[in-house]
Every structure is written in C-alpha cells, then in structure tokens.
Amino acid sequence: MSGGYVKIARGIFKHNMFKDEPFTEREVWIWLICGASYKDDTIRIPNTNIVTKIKRGEYMASYRFLATKFKWPISRVKRFIDRLKSGTMLSTRVVQGITFITIENYDEY
C-alpha cells in the first residue's frame, strides 16, 4: 500500500486494551498530529492568566509534560523534537515557558 489516508479517532491513545508503556517515535508523531488543534482558537495557558492564540496544526505542551506522557526522559523528548525540526516536520515557539509545536503541512495529515 503506497498512499491514501486512514481515519483514526483521537481517543485511540486512551483505549484500555493497550498497555501503558513508553511510546515509540512513530507513536509520538501520530500522537502529536492527533493532539494538534484542528482549528485556530484562543486558549488560556494552564495555571496562568495568560491568554494566547493557538493555530490549526499546533499543540501546546511543556517538555516535562511530553516526557511524562511518552514515558521518556526529557532529554530524549528534546532530541526527538529537534530531529523533527531539522527534518522540517515541525517547528516550535515558546510562550511563557510553554512550547507550541506546529505540525508543518498539517493539512496533509
């Protein structure tokens, strides 16, 4: 099979049939795509009074949160994000210590 799309429910990562174990790199990539905002929106950064805009294809998280979610050391999260950035798969911006991850070409996914 060499193309096309598959529709995946965003809740797949919460299904109780799957073990709660460290994510593979591919699972992290799919998780980021599934978690990205599907529309432009205005959000409040958790535990702050900061309100900011989030764009379609962006995901907001700290590296610490991602490390906990993926069951990875923070250093591995940073290295993987850097690798995806160098491959132009995503970009990042930081607002008040919170990283906004932009999935490049989000509409293709």
Which residues fall in each region the model found?
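Long, low-complexity, charged/polar intrinsically disordered regions in eukaryotic proteins
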Residues: M1-C34
